[in-house]
Amino acid sequence: MGNRGMEELIPLVNKLQDAFSSIGQSCHLDLPQIAVVGGQSAGKSSVLENFVGRDFLPRGSGIVTRRPLILQLIFSKTEHAEFLHCKSKKFTDFDEVRQEIEAETDRVTGTNKGISPVPINLRVYSPHVLNLTLIDLPGITKVPVGDQPPDIEYQIKDMILQFISRESSLILAVTPANMDLANSDALKLAKEVDPQGLRTIGVITKLDLMDEGTDARDVLENKLLPLRRGYIGVVNRSQKDIEGKKDIRAALAAERKFFLSHPAYRHMADRMGTPHLQKTLNQQLTNHIRESLPALRSKLQSQLLSLEKEVEEYKNFRPDDPTRKTKALLQMVQQFGVDFEKRIEGSGDQVDTLELSGGARINRIFHERFPFELVKMEFDEKDLRREISYAIKNIHGVRTGLFTPDLAFEAIVKKQVVKLKEPCLKCVDLVIQELINTVRQCTSKLSSYPRLREETERIVTTYIREREGRTKDQILLLIDIEQSYINTNHEDFIGFANAQQRSTQLNKKRAIPNQGEILVIRRGWLTINNISLMKGGSKEYWFVLTAESLSWYKDEEEKEKKYMLPLDNLKIRDVEKGFMSNKHVFAIFNTEQRNVYKDLRQIELACDSQEDVDSWKASFLRAGVYPEKDQAENEDGAQENTFSMDPQLERQVETIRNLVDSYVAIINKSIRDLMPKTIMHLMINNTKAFIHHELLAYLYSSADQSSLMEESADQAQRRDDMLRMYHALKEALNIIGDISTSTVSTPVPPPVDDTWLQSASSHSPTPQRRPVSSIHPPGRPPAVRGPTPGPPLIPVPVGAAASFSAPPIPSRPGPQSVFANSDLFPAPPQIPSRPVRIPPGIPPGVPSRRPPAAPSRPTIIRPAEPSLLD
């Protein structure tokens, strides 16, 4: 096998198998193993018991194996068994092992005859076994019995295919000798997933139960239905032997005697039997693992990379580290601070592309939602003019004023400034809600420690609420400051003279920068929601909003214009969301009760989210399209008061109206600039500093460290299992690395060498005795991988055969053919207890002059032979 590292391959695969089974998943990694497949009562379980040398598997009629049994055989000086689901217990009585298998099977499948794909992991340590990993699968059945579901045949087949379809699995196809090989369910399933026969090993059981005068010689010689890895025959105990408590070791001795004494099998007795099968499976599994090493290493590395992302927060410490709770607390708090800052400040590292972060949402509040709230409180023209006229009249009293009083201007401005408090405080509330949501998102990584997560959220949320009071006080102070002094000397204020010049202007909309250009305020997709089905139903268009009109096009290329709607006399109203609709809708209508589009009094425009609706409303406000007033207006009284003004009073009202509009715009601009700065300084930046510098101290003072770091049972189990798998994968990669660098690669021998069969069938039928090669050096396994090997890979001089014997073999070539063609292999190893009969014409002691045969000599299978794989 190369070196000691190769001998550790099977235990390594066992360790990975245990790690993955304990996690409850296969980690998408196909581990090399041997799956035992066969019909019901074909003798699969008996073969496994013969390997172990103990009776430990359930027996009975019908389906006995109802869950896959992953059997890990490990060579050890002591003999005991362990189950993965109860690691702490060592079973020395194998009757208890059988009872535990039955109990564990019933625990998952119930006491009826149902099956389950969840495997049972059993590890057997014994001085009588070779390292092997096998999977005992339920026997293939046709008819449901008892409480089995009617599709039991397909359930079992699907379960078997789940295990044998993996390219890394060898298939041990068990077929009884008293059954026609062409009808073998095991070989049929094996051919479905392994049509080339590269992974299939045939096992023929019940050779002693064949009808008198028949034998399975053609099958075992790989003539009838050839497999690349050949067939091995075994003889198990009969039911009478089992009931009579016949010892397995006595059964193995009887098996050995059967093959030595049977005339059809004695010439191949050294290649038959349970010990040879066990040795062959050990060799082939080890070689199979060696061939799978590159792909296995690649899969291990890929799995390790995916695991590193999941265990990043606790991969630097082991579960048995006594200081891990302190490390975990520090690491969790630091990670929480980093995550919070990234979500607020933004980061190019690991950007979330599915939803907006907390910082992006706060930015939208500052620059879309808050300006929208400011503009939404836009005063009504008629109400404002009426208030100005009342203020002028009340200031003059009984006197008739000749000049426009500036006190009326100050009174109206102060009244408008007070209205700013509500949208400003609402902005603070929106930001606080986003901050709290961000804290909850960041603490989701602390879910392993429920108490720590709860305390962290409580402490940070309490601090945010404290900062809320400070921030709101500061914002109210800013508004009071604006109200305390009306600075009419501001550089942006139009002044009295300009206000009089503008008194003749009737259009209050935003001035366009250049006469030849149209200011585009917003573009985007909207759905016209209230077009009747007779006219095509709801349709999506590309809308373009300017300072003068709303246009929509077929697509974003803006080539095919569908309609252009002037903004004069338009207003916005909310529309309730439909019961089955996931769209958010608002409507545009004409205040003069005119149709807006074709025969529609209002256009209902639909967006995907409420945020898009708010953003479009803010854009319409910039264009001068305001929301509909909720309260009913006394239009008659307003008209009466407005139109009853004399021309001089009307000019004074218009002048003050322009002054108020100019000064309120200055205040709005100042508030829009100071609000984000105030909130950032007093709330967001202070919260970040608190998390980085004071949160840990608050956590230590609020509760005991041990209680904070108490894990939920599920999270602790998941974390420990994941860490175990992580370290097992790293250890596996290290072992594979050592093997890869220190193993001397040799050409892999052919899976089957049946040249002895070919030579026997292609020459004279005269029975001859074949000489035997020298014995292999102790401790070295034969170089041939297949269970039915041909001649040895190391040629032996003919003269050396004088001390050994060989049984008679039919159709052995005569001496003329030996000397005529010196390229033939020397005779294969045979049983060393038979007397020597030297073929006539061969002088003893004459060695071959040909060089030793290469170990990678290709296998030749005669095309005339029928094949299972055709």
From Swiss-Prot:
GO terms for cellular component: centriole; centrosome; clathrin-coated pit; clathrin-coated vesicle; cytoplasm; cytosol; endocytic vesicle membrane; endosome. Residues 205-208 are annotated as: G4 motif. Changing residue 369 to W: In CNM1; reduced association with the centrosome. Residues 796-806 have a biased composition (Low complexity). Residues 64-66 are annotated as: G2 motif. Residues 136-139 are annotated as: G3 motif. Residues 28-294 form the Dynamin-type G domain. Its main location: cytoplasm. Residues 519-625 form the PH domain. Overexpression of CNM- and CMT-related DNM2 mutants in COS7 cells, whatever the mutated domain, led to a reduction in clathrin-mediated receptor endocytosis associated with MAPK ERK-1 and ERK-2 impairment. The membrane trafficking impairment process may represent a common pathophysiological pathway in the autosomal forms of CNM DNM2-CMT neuropathy. Residues 653-744 form the GED domain. It comes from Homo sapiens. Changing residue 618 to T: In CNM1; severe; does not affect PHD domain binding to vesicles composed of and 1-phosphatidyl-1D-myo-inositol 4,5-bisphosphate; induces the formation of high-order oligomers; does not affect phosphorylation; increases GTPase-mediated membrane fission; inhibits GTPase-mediated membrane fission by BIN1 in a dose-dependent manner. The modification Phosphothreonine is found at residue 755. InterPro entries: Dynamin (IPR022812), Dynamin_GTPase (IPR001401), Dynamin_GTPase_CS (IPR019762), Dynamin_N (IPR045063), Dynamin_stalk (IPR000375), G_DYNAMIN_dom (IPR030381), GED (IPR003130), GED_dom (IPR020850). Residues 235-238 are annotated as: G5 motif. One of its GO terms (molecular function) is SH3 domain binding. It is a peripheral membrane protein. Residues 756-767 have a biased composition (Polar residues). The modification Phosphotyrosine is found at residues 231, 597. Keywords: Acetylation, Cell junction, Cell projection, Charcot-Marie-Tooth disease, Coated pit, Cytoplasm, Cytoplasmic vesicle, Cytoskeleton, Disease variant, Endocytosis, Endosome, GTP-binding, Hydrolase, Membrane, Microtubule, Motor protein, Neurodegeneration, Neuropathy, Nucleotide-binding, Phagocytosis, Phosphoprotein, Synapse, Synaptosome. This is Dynamin-2. The gene is DNM2. The modification Phosphoserine is found at residues 764, 848. The modification N6-acetyllysine is found at residues 299, 598. The lineage of its organism: Eukaryota, Metazoa, Chordata, Craniata, Vertebrata. Belongs to the TRAFAC class dynamin-like GTPase superfamily. Dynamin/Fzo/YdjA family.
